[in-house]
């Protein structure tokens, strides 16, 4: 038996409802980001976040489950805003391992430039709060894993410099391109993070061969 399709008005109402939920979620994330940077995680008041987002605390708990869930969503929103996953996939799709590695470094620097203030707070928070560390370290481990894959391609192409093996080179490249390292350089030189690839790549050429054989 064929079922009647829902009326057009019903579908439109559902679409508007979903759009409203998404806008509410974004207001909460924006407010949470602001207060997280200003006061840190421990002093983060869900009541204040709710007030700024023009919702109730119940709405926050309904959407994010807990304060830690809200932190996780803020971190995920940062990655979504930056488009870092798509950027890394685009770099990995390059056939030349050297070009792919260069693109990965540039993408990483662009990622750090998305929201340096929030990155600083997340990194410092990860160092002192065990719960937050679990949320944030999983994302950093993803980045480190991505770096290892790009380095492995260079190793297969005989592009590692002595005395580096794949593991040594991967750890060194990951540390050199970490937010902490990049932020220190950018802050001292008063330049944007997305300009750091021009400095990092010559440094990393001491680990991997990025020029012609």
Where do the protein language model's features map onto the residues?
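Basic, helix-initiating cap at the start of DNA-binding domains
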Residues: 1-55, 62-69
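Amphipathic, non-transmembrane alpha-helical scaffold segments
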Residues: 21, 25, 75, 105, ...
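Alpha-helical DNA-contacting segments of helix-turn-helix folds
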Residues: 36, 71-78
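Short, basic, alpha-helical segments at the C-terminal edge of helix-turn-helix-like DNA-binding modules
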Residues: 46, 75-82
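Short helix-capping/turn signature of helix-turn-helix
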Residues: 64, 124-129, 179
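Hydrophobic alpha-helical connector segments
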Residues: 73, 86-114, 170
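Amphipathic alpha-helical packing segments from all-alpha helical-bundle domains
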Residues: 110-123, 131-157, 167-171, 202-209
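Hydrophobic/aromatic-rich alpha-helical bundle segments in the mid-to-C-terminal region
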Residues: 155-203, 211-213
């Amino acid at each position: 038996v064929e079922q009647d399709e829902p009326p057009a008005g019903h579908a439109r109402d559902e679409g508007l409802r979903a759009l409203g939920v998404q806008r509410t979620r974004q207001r909460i994330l924006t407010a949470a980001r602001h207060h997280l940077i200003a006061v840190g995680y421990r002093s983060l008041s869900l009541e204040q976040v709710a007030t700024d987002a023009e919702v109730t605390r119940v709405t926050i708990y309904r959407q994010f489950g807990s304060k830690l869930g809200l932190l996780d969503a803020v971190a995920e929103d940062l990655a979504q805003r930056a488009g870092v996953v798509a950027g890394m996939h685009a770099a990995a799709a390059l056939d030349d391992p050297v070009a792919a590695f260069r693109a990965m470094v540039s993408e990483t620097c662009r990622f750090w430039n998305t929201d340096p203030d929030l990155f600083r707070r997340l990194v410092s928070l990860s160092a002192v709060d065990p719960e937050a560390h679990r949320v944030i370290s999983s994302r950093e481990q993803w980045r480190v894993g991505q770096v290892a894959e790009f380095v492995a391609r260079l190793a297969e192409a005989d592009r590692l410099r002595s005395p580096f093996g794949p593991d040594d080179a991967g750890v060194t490249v990951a540390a050199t391109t970490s937010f902490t390292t990049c932020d220190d350089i950018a802050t001292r030189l008063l330049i944007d993070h997305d300009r750091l690839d021009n400095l990092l790549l010559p440094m990393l050429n001491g680990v991997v061969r990025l020029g012609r054989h």
